[in-house]
Amino acid sequence: MNARLTAALMLTALIAACSGGSDELRTQGGRYLTVVETLQNGLFQPEPELPNVTRALLDGLTVPSLEVAVPERDGLAYLVPLISRNDANLGPLDTWTTVDGTQLTLRSGVLVATRGLGDDVTSTDRRGSIAFVTGGGGANWPLRLDIQTSTDGVVRQDFNCTGQRNGRVTLEIVELTYPVESLSEICTDSSGARIENQYFVDTRDGTVWQTRQWAGEKIGYMNTRILKKK
């Protein structure tokens, strides 16, 4: 089975889980495949020349879409929802997937896990980050990332973080604009190494439309944008 057909079948299965009607499914699958079919060599490989993603294309879908870029790997991919749930006192947890099964998990827009990238984030302590993004939190908080490496097993990275509120701005994503608050999460480890995560949070309903988040030394920063919301 060639890569294009495999991608098409996996995409169709994902869309089938989110929408009904065979005619609608085939139409959406065809539209979305025009975007993802050039990503057949795997997620976040060097970026191919992608078709232009327009609002008209996105409006033709009933499934949400998440764009993820990894500048360190010169990679770009489009993901669709796999699992969503809302945990009491913890907030919504959303796992997104590509057609090849590589996954990214966000809680309230905050990165908590990756799968299939290599050197994946396997577990985290992001409670302080989530509180900050959702409007609460203290003056500082810990951030922990557990990274599954191919050579050293699980490597833990611990940071101490503070938050900075940068004010309200207008964010544009594929022909639509959103009123957002710009947030920075500034973290240092025991050696003095510094990372900075960025979040753009809708001032109306708290949707985290766009982020830039650290995912470990091998992956570097991951940039996410919600192209189409649930």
Predicted regions mapped to residue ranges:
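Acidic, serine/threonine-rich low-complexity disordered tracts
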Residues: 19-116, 122-123, 138-230
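C-terminal partner/receptor-binding element of secreted or periplasmic proteins
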Residues: 128, 134-139
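Intrinsically disordered, low-complexity regions
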Residues: 36, 127-130
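C-terminal motif of bacterial Sec signal peptides marking the signal peptidase cleavage site
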Residues: 14-17
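Bacterial N-terminal signal peptides that target proteins for export
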Residues: 1-7
